[in-house]
Amino acid sequence: MSDFTQTLDTDGLATITWDCQARPMNVMSKQGFADLNALINGCLTDPMVEGVIITSAKSDFAAGMDLAVIAETKDMHPENPAQGCFEMVMEIHQILRKIELAGMDFKTKKGGKPIVAVLPGTALGIGLEIPLACHHIICADNPKAKIGLPEIKVGIFPGAGGTTRLVRKMGAMAASPYLLQGKLCSPSQAQAAGIIDAVSTTPLEDAKAWILAAKDTDLVKPWDAKGYKMPGGAPYHPAGFMTFVGASAMEIGRASCRERV
């Protein structure tokens, strides 16, 4: 059975629900991405679909990527495992970019379908990277939930766009604790930091209302809009350059301290 299923209501709103039934929390697999991609394709081409909600049937959204996928991909490409992993990551990028553009004409920035992520609870790794590609992120008012990109803690980095989207959304300095330290936060902290858009006691209802009220301009990511400037300065802007230099020095120092303890 697929980890992703879809329903369509009378308002033309499709709800894609993630539910890995054999696991206590959702984790992403290669087949899971293929299933999600197929549903997104269907929603974007179906004239009956006005907008999409991506959510979870569980009390949490997702624990991240199934790390076994990396090992499996390497085994499938013994002659060049690095190339195999690269191609897999690029396929994931294409799926998330498809969600981000949502069928819009890139020149006119019109014609897209609004896609909202509704997080009932914890969203980690790919469980946050998928929402970051959506046009609006609403998290349930769940104080036990944790939101973040903890990949760095196991020696990898958020390879599905988390590094680029979070930096472009928040700026390098603000994003660095989440990317370089794997910092996790509560829904209210994530909203205050600008990672998610809203915390709600009725997230599904709020998502439907947002979709029905959304305009073309609401679907355009800041970094796709004309005149976009990265918060805090781009890497080679004077302010941005100092951020990158300072962040590198601080992380090297922090890592050295941990090694000595």
Across the structure, where does each feature detected by a protein language model lie?
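Intrinsically disordered, low-complexity segments enriched in small/flexible residues
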Residues: L13-T15, K30-A34, L39-I40, A174-S176, ...
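Glycine-rich beta-to-alpha active-site loop
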Residues: I99-V154, Y178
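Hydrophobic, secondary-structure "cap" segments at the distal end of domains
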Residues: G162-M173
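Conserved CoA-thioester-binding segment of acyl-CoA-metabolizing enzymes
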Residues: M1-T55, E79, G253
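Glycine- (often His-adjacent) and acidic-residue-rich active-site loop
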Residues: S56-I95, A123, K153-G155
